[in-house]
Amino acid sequence: MDKRATILLKTLIERYIAEGQPVGSRTLSKYSGLDLSPATIRNVMSDLEEMGFIASPHTSAGRVPTPRGYRLFVDTMLTAGPLDILGMHDRMAQQIAGTIAEQVRAQLASHGSESSQRVIAAAAQTLSNLSQFAGIVMTPRRTHAFRQIEFLRLSETRILLIVVTPEGDVQNRIIHTDTPYTPSQLVEAANYINAHYGGMTFDAVRERLRGELNALQADMTSLMQAAVEAGSSAVSDEDPVVISGERKLLEVEDLSSSMDKLRRLFAVFEQKTGLLQLLDVSSRAEGVQIFIGGESSLVPHEDMAVITAPYEVDGKIVGTLGVIGPMRMAYERVIPIVDITAKLLSSTLSQH
């Protein structure tokens, strides 16, 4: 594609993102900065349509970008991108990035002393608030281990099991027992489990207990077995994806202009399997990834785009976050939001 066609395609996509209306030759002449006749512009548009980068809606003389056109745009034409590739000379871009960073930092800092799960939920909400689309975070892959447990006697036959994970999350489960344990017995049992099994997965503890049951008193054995089963349930019963701002997408005409589009939109969030697959794929790559519906089989809605970035804890990638929005979104604004949030979430979780 020659430079003239590239400029016209870039201008067309920018105007369509800004206005949401098919773009005609008069608009391209006005905004492209090229001194071309309307006939020449129409010829170039015809060539771009043949190449599959733009299409003509039946109701308009103008053109709109196709998924292939958006792909070329985000890969080669964007003037903004992740922070580490923004030119330092671009003072305005740096000011925008700084403003976004301060907003994200303030949101995450207010939850910094809380569990990692709440910090992750705050990150999803921040992504949604700043982008005005849906924010999504794939939670860290869990080892289903525990750092320590505690027992709290609620009644003669009801005990509250408190499980603290290596990530600092706290989960609770109620255990029903046939034996009336005293508070001192519960402290003794918790101390034994923490001293011998702290830091292990519940599956590993289950295996160890099978070989050590003879050394324990019968009533302690049943309590520990119940604690292992309840604890395993507590740490594994966690939604792998946190989503915030789904309702904002109902206000996006491109995604909700018909009942069929609405049904497909709700299916995306109800099933989550497609989103999980997409987030898992993006966690294996470095930096910001852009997935465009109709162009990527990973995007579960043809009019949708997903911008993602992996986040780390202590230098190791543990999950992915991103923004779900329409294909017609301001990529140069949303990409830095995703990039900064991933970096600051990594920093916040690593300090936990």
Swiss-Prot record:
GO function terms (MF aspect): DNA binding
Keyword Transcription listed: yes
Gene3D superfamilies: 3.30.450.40, Winged helix-like DNA-binding domain superfamily/Winged helix DNA-binding domain
InterPro entries attached to this UniProt entry: GAF-like_dom_sf (IPR029016), HrcA (IPR002571), HrcA_C (IPR021153), WH-like_DNA-bd_sf (IPR036388), WH_DNA-bd_sf (IPR036390)
Matching Pfam families: HrcA
Thylakoid among keywords: no
GO biological process: negative regulation of DNA-templated transcription
Keywords, sorted A to Z: Repressor, Stress response, Transcription, Transcription regulation
Protein family (similarity comment): Belongs to the HrcA family.
NCBIfam families from the UniProt entry: hrcA
Protein role: Negative regulator of class I heat shock genes (grpE-dnaK-dnaJ and groELS operons). Prevents heat-shock induction of these operons.
Record-given protein name: Heat-inducible transcription repressor HrcA
Species of the source: Ralstonia nicotianae (strain ATCC BAA-1114 / GMI1000) (Ralstonia solanacearum)
Origin organism lineage: Bacteria, Pseudomonadati, Pseudomonadota, Betaproteobacteria, Burkholderiales
Gene: hrcA
